[in-house]
Amino acid sequence: MKVIKYYNNKDVRLDDDLKPQIYSKEILVKVKKSGICGSDVLEHYRLTKMKKLGVPYLVLGHEIAGDIVEVGKDVTDYKVGDKVFVSHHVPCFDCHYCRQGHQTACELLHNTNFDPGGFAEYVRIPAVNIEKKGVYVLSNNISYEEGVFIEPLGCVCRAQRLANVSKGQTVLILGSGVSGLLHLQLAKIRGANKVITTDVNEYHIKMAKQFGAEAVLYANTDISSIIKDINDEKLPDVIIVCTGAVSAAKQAIQCAGPGSKVVFFAVPGPGVNIEIPINDFWRNEVTIMTSYGAAPIDLDMAYNWLLAKRINVIDLITHRLPFSKAQEGFNLVSEAKDSLKVVLEPDEIQDN
């Protein structure tokens, strides 16, 4: 079968590999669509992992939708022909962190994956992913392309659930890429009175306006002052950081007012520290929080929003490319110019 091998952001190759063989409690999925996530192009993170594992390349890809083509003899809940989304990470539900509601901090979740990765024609789904409810049979009303968004939208659902984004709030979203525009849509659904977004990219700014932001600001301006001018002299209730730029992290701190919640949905690279005016935050009861990944409850929410057609994900797809043009796709995502979501698919699908 064909797989996409990642050596670094500028060296992504289509190559041959063995088709995975499944065991009795596993399933084999033929990939139809696979999205490139922003985390796939976090080069420092990927190279560190490769060094730790002692391997020259990785087969990435975790936003997949496809069809079950083989089922192990002991699998009872799924059948050949099912159209599915598969979660690459699953929590155990039993550990201390899971019981406390921190499923994405679960050790099992951080160590589960499918084989080899979503940028392959076929992926083997291990028994644990099946047992822990990581396989979702998709309704006929959800396309493969929509299925690709269950995981990234699930991450967004988790962040806003933890921050309790709710009716009447002003929400500031720093970064108007794919995750920022998903946050924009969900915040409006959850009842936010005003959603303000920022970016430095003209295309992203245009898209944020198209998706209904009440205000779209250039990130290289004094956004805290502008927000006060358009928000009755108040700073945002919720601030969601959707870019790893250090400047955005600093802006998030600067834009926090009385009662604000600052959610780091994305963070700068390792070793970066941000100064916190802790005395001001103490007297104003500012909350700083992080959100990582998606738990099953969040994936369920994402699935239901997509099923109800409340979240527009199709218009976030700017490029549909065959596996053979994976390098072009990685360039588009890493450079983040006139693009949003890039979806890859096996060449035979493109040819048909």
Predicted regions, residues:
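Short Gly/Pro-enriched turn/cap motifs at secondary-structure boundaries
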Residues: 7, 18-19, 55-61, 111-117, ...
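Glycine-rich beta-strand-centered segment in the early N-terminal region that forms part
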Residues: 20-34, 48-99, 136-139
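Short glycine-centered segments of the SAM/dcSAM-binding site in methyltransferase folds
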Residues: 83, 170, 260-261, 287
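NAD(P)H dinucleotide-binding glycine-rich loop of Rossmann-like/cofactor-binding domains
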Residues: 92-174
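Mid-domain Rossmann-like dinucleotide-binding core that forms the NAD(H)/NADP(H) cofactor-binding site
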Residues: 140-221
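Glycine-rich cofactor phosphate-binding loops and adjacent beta1-alpha1 units
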Residues: 163, 206, 211-285, 327, ...
